Amino acid sequence: MLLLVTLALLAGPTCRAQNILGNNVGTYFYVAGEEHGQLRGIRIFLTVIDLIKGIQLRFGGNWSDVYGSRSLKYKEFLLEDGEHVTQVSGTRKLCLTSLSFTTNKGRVVTFGVRRGLSFNESGGSDKYLVTVNGLYAPGLCLNGMGFKWKNIHDDFDDNDDDKEDDDDEHDDDNEEDHGDKDNDNDHDDDHDDDDDDKEDDNEEDVDDERDDKDDDEEDDDNDKENDKDDGEGSGDDDDNDDEDDDKDDDGGSGDDGDDGDDDEDDDGGDDDNGDEEEE
């Protein structure tokens, strides 16, 4: 079992180092960050005697970690829009002594000093450099380097896929917008229905108020007529009472006249009796 584990550990670096140019000894590294975009810049750290000590790549607008070692002495190369690395060459001894990068626009940049055994790597006319891997001796230098290439036509396929995805997302967004718009229209319809119901309620309330007002006015008119009738009835009764009182008074006065006549008759009788006595 221990033997199998040992073989597996040894096989890992060996397999990974098969495509590495230079010395196949040291600590393996792979420059990650390609998910952030295409290769847009290269920064190489150098030793005092211009050996390749460390490397850092820029993907899109992001710089990767430094693989190998940093140093105060470094050089960088930035790619223009639409520019890609199409070829890499270099020289090596125990360490990498130089690296040269050629672009599709014909520009060439060299890091370090060319000395030692040379090597050359190209993905072909229709490929460009994506990222690099390699081996390094910690604190000393880079021992070897490998290169990952990508077919330029894959970008068109990826762009088409991205465009289709964008179109699908756009369609989904449009459908969602239409759905939201329909919901808004339904909501507006509900508001309109609520407003109509509110107007109907207001009209009903106004009609009820008018009916109540008419009823109140009718009641007031009836009350006034009743009061008027009561007042006229009371006046007639008072007049009748006054007439009866006057009539009674007149009757009493007649009686008094009769009494006066009776008194006169009595006086006349007395006079006649006196005359008879004198005779």
Curated annotation (Swiss-Prot):
Glycosylation sites: N62
Compositionally biased residues, Acidic residues: 160-177, 185-279
Modified residues (Pyrrolidone carboxylic acid): Q18
UniProt keywords, alphabetically: Glycoprotein, Lectin, Pyrrolidone carboxylic acid, Signal
Entry-linked InterPro entries: Jacalin-like_lectin_dom, Jacalin-like_lectin_dom_sf, PolyBind_ProtTraffic
Jacalin-type lectin domain boundaries: 18-151
Signal peptide: 1-17
Annotated function: Spermine-binding protein is an androgen regulated ventral prostate glycoprotein that binds various polyamines.
Official protein name in the record: Prostatic spermine-binding protein
Higher taxonomy: Eukaryota, Metazoa, Chordata, Craniata, Vertebrata
